[in-house]
């Protein structure tokens, strides 16, 4: 039974569902003080969300529309105009596209089994999407630059509102783990939700970045990206985490096409590389606990060709056990021992939204890292594959398609 079939078309007096939904769908207002005035406004907004939760007709209509995905080449060569008309064109595209993509994801939440969909954390994320849909569809058509500037403010707000969605989904599904009977359904839901989120954030961030005049960039697209430099940035990040946890970190050697430069979008690399590097360093340190200050290097090889970019990360961390190899790409599987660390205090996925900066955090956690990285790579027309020699180490191959237009590319 799915969530919508149980919820029906609207709340009824005395319905037993209200206690189940709990505090996420209720807010008491007791006074008219300055603080409570804010609570009144929040209550009104959440009341609208609840109404929309039960009145899905507008969402259903939009969810039937197909998504219009752009190639990076289209984004790169859309050009700039002195009068700012490119910003209006981009803003109008977003205004049409974002509600469609969000409606598709709301439909995905409604397809979840009832017991999972009613988990308070999952329900909170569902509510975030409904609220975003409301705000986007309530915004009047963009007619001029003043409208576009207001729309940018809304987009920034929504990006901030949704910055913790990955962590919340991981937490909610971990809480619901014992109720999951169909692993394939959950994997499909997560693949779709996480890659859709990546696409939305790329498009939204690209539009905001079009307002900036940054050398070698058109929006979020770097016209002369150096794989070596972006790898070095995340090597430094991963080594700091590793040193904080283990007191030392493996050295990293980078070889191959180290001088390569080409147009590319750094954002997916900023999402995937930290996870792969943390895995390699953790495996290396934990397989050499007797000699923590004498550990083998992690070796990264860059291979650039006319079709794609390949990054191989090789470690001597003992490899992956045969019994685990088929499961490492499954959501919520992790080779790390269970930890009592509260994920809300130190979220594993902070780096996915570029908010971790230099802070230290856990070297392992929910078991979302590899499957999320795989989903992102496949969404971008590439792949993520592992070759493991148990007792020796692991090679991870990240393959991403070029965006220069010479070969067929992916769509965002």
Curated annotation (Swiss-Prot):
GO terms for biological process: branched-chain amino acid catabolic process; isoleucine catabolic process; L-leucine catabolic process; lipid biosynthetic process; regulation of acetyl-CoA biosynthetic process from pyruvate; regulation of glucose metabolic process; spermatogenesis; valine catabolic process. Residues 1-30 form a transit peptide. GO terms for molecular function: [3-methyl-2-oxobutanoate dehydrogenase (acetyl-transferring)] kinase activity; ATP binding; protein kinase activity; protein serine kinase activity; protein serine/threonine kinase activity; protein serine/threonine phosphatase activity; pyruvate dehydrogenase (acetyl-transferring) kinase activity. K(+) binds at residues 328, 330, 333, 367. Gene3D superfamilies: Alpha-ketoacid/pyruvate dehydrogenase kinase, N-terminal domain (1.20.140.20), Histidine kinase-like ATPase, C-terminal domain (3.30.565.10). The modification Phosphoserine is found at residues 31, 356, 360. ATP binds at residues 279, 315, 334-335, 364, 367, 370. Its main location: mitochondrion. It is found in: Mitochondrion matrix; Mitochondrion. GO terms for cellular component: mitochondrial matrix; mitochondrion; oxoglutarate dehydrogenase complex. Keywords: Acetylation, ATP-binding, Kinase, Mitochondrion, Nucleotide-binding, Phosphoprotein, Transferase, Transit peptide. Residues 159-404 form the Histidine kinase domain. Expressed in heart and liver. CDD domains: HATPase_PDK-like. The modification N6-acetyllysine is found at residues 192, 233. Its EC number is 2.7.11.1, 2.7.11.4. It catalyses: L-seryl-[3-methyl-2-oxobutanoate dehydrogenase] + ATP = O-phospho-L-seryl-[3-methyl-2-oxobutanoate dehydrogenase] + ADP + H(+); L-seryl-[protein] + ATP = O-phospho-L-seryl-[protein] + ADP + H(+). The ATP-ase activity is up-regulated by potassium and rubidium ions but not by sodium ions. Up-regulated in the presence of apo- or lipoylated-DBT/E2b subunit of the BCKDH complex. InterPro entries: AK/P_DHK_N_sf, BCDHK/PDK_N, BCKD/PDK, HATPase_C_sf, His_kinase_dom, Sig_transdc_His_kin-like_C. Mg(2+) binds at residue 279. This is Branched-chain alpha-ketoacid dehydrogenase kinase. It comes from Rattus norvegicus. The gene is Bckdk.
């Amino acid at each position: 039974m799915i969530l919508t079939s149980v919820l029906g078309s609207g709340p009824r007096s005395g319905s037993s569902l209200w206690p189940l939904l709990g505090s996420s769908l209720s807010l008491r207002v007791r006074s008219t003080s300055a603080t409570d005035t804010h609570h009144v406004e929040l209550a009104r907004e959440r009341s609208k969300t609840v109404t929309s939760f039960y009145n899905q007709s507008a969402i259903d209509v939009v969810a039937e529309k197909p998504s219009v995905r752009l190639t990076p080449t289209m984004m790169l060569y859309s050009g700039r105009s002195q009068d700012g008309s490119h910003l209006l064109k981009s803003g109008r595209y977003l205004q049409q596209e974002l509600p469609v993509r969000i409606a598709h994801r709301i439909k995905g939440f409604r397809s979840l089994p009832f017991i999972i969909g009613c988990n308070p954390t999952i329900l909170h994320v569902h509510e975030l999407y409904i609220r975003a849909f409301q705000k986007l569809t309530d915004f009047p058509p963009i007619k001029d630059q003043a409208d576009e500037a207001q729309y940018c403010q809304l987009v920034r707000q929504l990006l901030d509102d949704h910055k913790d969605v990955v962590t919340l989904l991981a937490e909610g599904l971990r809480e619901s783990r014992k109720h999951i009977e169909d692993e394939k359904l959950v994997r499909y839901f997560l693949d779709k939700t996480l890659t859709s989120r990546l696409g939305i954030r790329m498009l939204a961030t690209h539009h905001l970045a079009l307002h900036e005049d940054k050398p070698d960039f058109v929006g979020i697209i770097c016209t002369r990206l150096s794989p070596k430099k972006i790898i070095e940035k995340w090597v430094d990040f991963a080594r700091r985490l590793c040193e904080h946890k283990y007191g030392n970190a493996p050295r990293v050697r980078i070889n191959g096409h180290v001088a390569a430069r080409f147009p590319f979008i750094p954002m997916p690399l900023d999402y995937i590389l930290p996870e792969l590097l943390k895995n390699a360093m953790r495996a290396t340190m934990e397989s050499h606990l007797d000699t923590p200050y004498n550990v083998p290097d992690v070796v990264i090889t860059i291979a650039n060709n006319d079709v794609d970019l390949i990054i191989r990360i090789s470690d001597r961390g003992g490899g992956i056990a045969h019994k685990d190899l088929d499961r490492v790409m499954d959501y919520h599987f992790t080779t790390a021992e269970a930890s009592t660390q509260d994920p809300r205090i130190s979220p594993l996925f902070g780096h996915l939204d570029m908010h971790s900066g230099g802070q230290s955090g856990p070297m392992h956690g929910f078991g979302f890292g590899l499957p999320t990285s795989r989903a992102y790579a496949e969404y971008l027309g590439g792949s993520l594959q592992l070759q493991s020699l148990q007792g020796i180490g692991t090679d991870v191959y990240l393959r991403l398609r070029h965006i220069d237009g010479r070969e067929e590319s992916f769509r965002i």
